[in-house]
Amino acid sequence: MTEQLRQAALDFHEFPIPGKIEVTPTKSLATQRDLALAYSPGVAEPCLEIEKDPAASYKYTARGNLVAVISNGTAVLGLGNIGALAGKPVMEGKGVLFKKFAGINVFDIEVNEHDPDKLVDIIASLEPTFGGVNLEDIKAPECFYIEQKLRERMNIPVFHDDQHGTAIISAAAIINSLRIVGKKIEDVRLVASGAGAASIACLNLLLSLGMKRENITVCDSKGVVYKGRDDKMDQTKKEYAIEDNGWRKLADAIPNADIFLGCSAAGALTQDMVKSMAAHPIILALANPNPEITPPEAKAVRPDAIVCTGRSDYPNQVNNVLCFPFIFRGALDVGATTINEEMKRAAVYAIADLALEEQNEVVTSAYGGEGATFGADYVIPRPFDPRLIVRIAPAVAKAAMESGVATRPIQNWDAYVEKLTQFVYKTSLFMRPIFSQAKSAKQRIILAEGEENKALHATQEVISMGLANPILIGRRSVIEEKIKKLGLRLTAGVDFEIVDNEDNPRYEECWKHYYELTKRKGITPAIAKRVVRSNTTVLASTLLSLGYADALVCGLFGSYGKHLASIRDIIGLKDGVKTAAALNSLVLPTGNVFLTDTHVNSNPTAEELAEITLMAAEEIHRFGIEPAVALLSHSNFGSSDSLGAPKMREVLQIVKERNPHLMIDGEMRGDLAMNEAHRKELMPDSPLKGSANLLVFPDLSASRISYSLLRGTTTAITVGPILMGMNKSAHILNPGASVRRIINMIAYAAVKAQQE
């Protein structure tokens, strides 16, 4: 490690707050009543319920989503026996991964105890605190004994990740590598270098998957493990000892081996050894930080090899983060009393099968836009694949239920999988009613920028989710080439439709229609012909106007204003509507809030704002949410007559006249809009109850500044902008829109088209 990187790592852990984790309350502690409920005397009630029924601890405490990461520091990463305290940064890091990838809370516990029996007693005594235990960085062979004793004594999952996490990912890599080379697990011969916790766990799992014990040869630092050897032989090694056939070194055992499993040391596997392996060798060189052999070294002598390492700078990274958060997620969610072999095997196949699917846009973005398809350089999923949680956790949970170790079985699997998506896509719960409605009657949705990578990834997801029938505008050759490059499973004419703007059979109909709509706006036939061929938003709007689609989504490049001008010219405003406007939603940890007008009107009149407010309230209803509207200003309830305050008071009167049942009040400052207690101090009889969920701003500057601040200073996720007031469902995103935002907008556009 360079000195610069070393210092960066130290700074990362020290600033702005030492360490990587903290405890955050999940309940409000703002009032005396809150304290009385959270602690004395209110806390006595859940205590008494748990005393009557210990299972109630999962109902009234955080235990069901809390895992202990426990280590004695005897085998820390590649650092060895550095002690419990020195290993604490690693354990905190493990906790961060649990939280990031699976939403699981963690207490890291470093125990300064080397005696296995005492360590077992200490850990077992902590069972009332946790829903599961992740053992970490405990050296072999003690780790085998400790885990086994804890599994016998505890009624919660105990999982030594160094053993089983590595084993599960390695097994998935081997399963898929065998698929690629056309070999069967019961026929192949494996040579292992290393006989520590990870290696033995890998071998045990492979046996349960069908590998034959007689086809396995194990080597350690003393050479081949064979019957009759006395040096450094413990019980776990003896189980894999072969008959003495004269082999003494790794070099003796490796010729004609199909698989090399390395959990040993850098350089242990030489190029000469690789040369001697069977056809299409499978090499797992998992030593860290440097593998037994690097992929370039192995490929130089055996181009037909499939090589996996533990490093992120090579293909096929065997990384435990691919499984441990999701195995615990599934185990916790069904109240599993253990993690058994059935659950591990379920995880293996869930991981292996995911690699067979098309690439996800989140993964592609995380790896610099680089796509991958199943093959020698992509045998297991990548760690940032958001589908891991929705594949592994349900598979593990089902296996727990089927094998009889689940105490809280899942009844509704669709709802469970949807709940899991919230750990990846924060808009999932918010968009649930929209997705359900979109699926009920699929609409034809045009994506104006169909050649964009994000549009193609969104199309793949939309089709997989059954949300709509996409129509992509773009050059057919470009779209098909990008689909291939991105590793997507899309077929034009089967999964989606292409409208090739350079070879459009409806070209004449489109340009003539566009000309008729715009001939009094300076558009000549010659201009119309050129624009319809070159401007994809114009073409999309024209197709929508002609009835060849039900809705459109555009804006992945170009300015909002130019897209809006095209849509307004061709689609036009809805009957009775005088102005278009934009509505954005922000999904915040404290709830969802809508803001308007965020894109269109720079300084709308009171009449225009009233119309915008009523349109926004109608849009909010589509999400199954009852609008609670705050008209914002710098003043509160008539305290000022300057700037936009009088205008907002006029808006209130107009809206009340047109919709007396809408919950609305104003004008008011933003803090009053979001805090009912403060609002009541100034206006006790305000009809607005709770926090406002629709914020109406006096002008574009105020709305854009507020929107940007909320997005930039919170963890808010945006949905929108939703274009309101148009004659058909047409919406404009922005160039920074994520694939998920495109998917959300396609679904919303579809629902709006259904209802209009």
UniProtKB/Swiss-Prot annotation:
A divalent metal cation binds at residues 136-137, 162. InterPro entries: Aminoacid_DH-like_N_sf (IPR046346), Malate_Decarboxylase (IPR051674), Malic_enzyme_CS (IPR015884), Malic_N_dom (IPR012301), Malic_N_dom_sf (IPR037062), Malic_NAD-bd (IPR012302), Malic_NAD-bd_bact_type (IPR045213), ME_PTA (IPR012188). NADP(+) binds at residues 195-198, 288, 320. Residues 429-756 are annotated as: Phosphate acetyltransferase. The keyword Metal-binding applies. Keywords: Metal-binding, Multifunctional enzyme, NADP, Oxidoreductase. SUPFAM superfamilies: Aminoacid dehydrogenase-like, N-terminal domain, Isocitrate/Isopropylmalate dehydrogenase-like, NAD(P)-binding Rossmann-fold domains. Divalent metal cations. Prefers magnesium or manganese. The active site is at 39 (proton donor), 94 (proton acceptor). Residues 1-428 are annotated as: Malic enzyme. It holds the Pfam family Malic_M. GO terms for biological process: malate metabolic process. GO terms for molecular function: acyltransferase activity; malate dehydrogenase (decarboxylating) (NADP+) activity; metal ion binding; NAD binding; oxaloacetate decarboxylase activity. Its EC number is 1.1.1.40. In the N-terminal section; belongs to the malic enzymes family. This is NADP-dependent malic enzyme. The gene is maeB.
